[in-house]
Amino acid sequence: MKEILITNDDGFEATGLLALKEALSELDGVNVTIVAPSSEKSACAHSLTLTRPLRFIKLDDNFFKLDDATPSDCVYLALHALYNKKPDLVISGINHGANLGEDITYSGTCGAAMEGVLQGIRSIAFSQFYENNSLNELGFELAKEVVKFITPKVLNDEISLNPREFLNVNIPATTSKNFKGYAVVPAGRRTYATHATLNRNPRGIEYYWLGNAALEYEKGEPSDISKVNEGFATITPIKLNMTSYESLESLKGKFDAK
């Protein structure tokens, strides 16, 4: 029996999480444990909670929410408190929205996969791309097919992942009928506009809402961004070693002792 730990950043009631659970329940020989945040934690990246205690709340057999926790908290604490032996796989998702290009650095979905990798466990992040608030209409049927296609390949070692790497998978905003297939591509490059909306509360105190600016991307070589827009499910291996080897040697010449 293969053990899979799943979490997300949209919270324990998210339809994407339940779709992931349903998809994995259709696979033979797997046992799934869910530990998810008690509320939405989008864009919390790889943050851990170090300034207050965390509490498991059991919802069902093998289904827990972690009170006011981040996705990385869920992975970290599940491994230390619920497992005597490490699970075979950590899966994060299915995220409500894509995690493309530099989204990966903000994403709590990807942050949970990073935590799994840091703990020595193979990990996958799944995200469902959608447009114009169409997620309810689109649903997760194609995403579930993608999960059922990719997950066994990782579990059965058909896909070899290097240590400290995880797979970032984005599902296109289309149906199974119009699905183009799979594209293994690098992460693209987003162009982020700085945007914040200023408001005032009834006492006249100012506050801001961040975000809501349109996201663009740099066109050129095929990437996760371009291919998911063409109807492909994109698969991008992400490594945690962030050293810029291109600059390493030139910097050594300027700073190393003579």
From Swiss-Prot:
Binds 1 divalent metal cation per subunit. It comes from the Bacteria. InterPro entries: SurE, SurE-like_Pase/nucleotidase, SurE-like_sf. GO terms for cellular component: cytoplasm. One of its GO terms (molecular function) is metal ion binding. Its EC number is 3.1.3.5. The keyword Cytoplasm applies. Keywords: Cytoplasm, Hydrolase, Metal-binding, Nucleotide-binding. Pfam families: SurE (PF01975). It catalyses: a ribonucleoside 5'-phosphate + H2O = a ribonucleoside + phosphate. The keyword DNA damage does not apply. It is an enzyme of class 3 (hydrolase). It is found in: Cytoplasm. Its cofactor is a divalent metal cation. A divalent metal cation binds at D9, D10, S42, N95. Nucleotidase that shows phosphatase activity on nucleoside 5'-monophosphates. Belongs to the SurE nucleotidase family. This is 5'-nucleotidase SurE. It comes from Campylobacter concisus (strain 13826).
